[in-house]
Each structure stands twice: as structure tokens, then as C-alpha cells.
Amino acid sequence: MKPSDMRQLKAEDFQKEIDSRKKELMELRFQAAMGNLAQPHRVTQLRREVAQLNTIRGEQRAGEQK
């Protein structure tokens, strides 16, 4: 998901998106530990998306407080 698409999300959808990505990340880490990870680049991609979602959510909260 692109950051421009992330900015279009509603406030309640942010946590759902973050939770789903963290769950997938946990599953991929488990696969990596077992030695059968098919897409190792996906771990980095998910970590980046979670960070972007958290950053955008923080920006929106800061904008609401002003």
C-alpha cells in the first residue's frame, strides 16, 4: 500500500491495517525461523508499512490537536 493510499484511510481503519500487517509479519518471522521463508523481502516491506502507518496516524492526530 502506498503512503498516499494510507492517508485516505479513516482513523478506525489504521489500527486494523496495522494489526493485520503485524500478524502477517509474525507469521513470516515464524517461517524464517523454521527455514522455509519463500519471500524474505516481504519482512522488510511489512516493517516499513507498519512504520508508515504509525507515522501517518501520528501526523493526523497532531493535526487534529492543533
Swiss-Prot record:
Swiss-Prot/TrEMBL GO biological process terms: translation
Matches recorded under Pfam families: Ribosomal_L29
GO terms for cellular component: cytosolic large ribosomal subunit
GO molecular function term, any single one: structural constituent of ribosome
Keyword field: Ribonucleoprotein, Ribosomal protein
Family classification: Belongs to the universal ribosomal protein uL29 family.
The name this protein goes by in its record: Large ribosomal subunit protein uL29
Organism per entry: Deinococcus deserti (strain DSM 17065 / CIP 109153 / LMG 22923 / VCD115)
